[in-house]
């Protein structure tokens, strides 16, 4: 074999394992990380301003997954915070609140299914997001609340799944809205949309 041909063959033989290893590594990385959803946040756009919440999938994976799914479907868009108790929490996520004629039934709506409770060690402090439910621990669906005070008596009895990282002033504004019978706000507090976005897109 000519010297040049021999050198070329040796070079190809040396490089092939390198290319193969690089391709294999890239395929493994793609397989292991098809889509990074652990670093996502929720942008809760309301008639009073925007709030941004981070998630706790390490302690409430199914709850976080359900909330993100509903948000991506536009389920929460056009709903309202229908129950407000200053110093305690603001509650929303009921699809019935899209219809003013169903006001008497507000607080009873759901997505048509229930999810299992994921009680955990996260404490209910100001800004924490948690799932609303009935007396049945496994009755949460879509309704959630954001703590205004520090209702730690709810710990390990309600599924905390995230907390606000921006918009505390909006929480304060909503929580101090004047209310009437049934803790209903006297003016409508719209949830215009809830969008799931990468955390690094938030400034």
Regions found by a protein language model. Name each.
Residues 1-6:
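N-terminal secretory signal peptides that target proteins for export/translocation
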Residues 9-21:
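Bacterial N-terminal signal peptides
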Residues 20-203:
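Cyclophilin-like peptidyl-prolyl cis-trans isomerases
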């Amino acid at each position: 074999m000519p010297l040049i041909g021999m050198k070329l063959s040796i070079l190809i033989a040396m490089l092939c394992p390198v290319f193969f290893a690089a391709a294999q590594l890239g395929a493994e990385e793609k397989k292991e990380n098809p889509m990074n959803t652990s670093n996502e946040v929720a942008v809760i756009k309301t008639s009073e301003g925007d709030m941004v919440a981070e998630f706790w999938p390490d302690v409430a994976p199914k709850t976080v997954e359900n909330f993100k799914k509903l948000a991506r479907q536009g389920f929460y868009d056009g709903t309202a915070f229908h129950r407000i108790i200053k110093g305690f929490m603001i509650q929303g996520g009921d699809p019935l609140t899209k219809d003013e004629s169903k006001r008497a039934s507000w607080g009873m709506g759901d997505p048509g299914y229930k999810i299992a409770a994921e009680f955990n060690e996260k404490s209910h402090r100001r800004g924490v997001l948690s799932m609303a439910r009935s007396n049945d621990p496994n009755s949460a669906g879509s309704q959630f609340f954001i703590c205004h005070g520090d209702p730690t008596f709810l710990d390990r009895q309600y599924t905390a799944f995230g907390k606000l990282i921006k918009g505390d002033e909006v929480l304060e504004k909503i929580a101090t809205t004047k209310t009437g019978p049934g803790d209903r706000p006297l003016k409508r507090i719209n949830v215009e949309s809830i969008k799931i976005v990468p955390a690094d897109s938030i400034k």
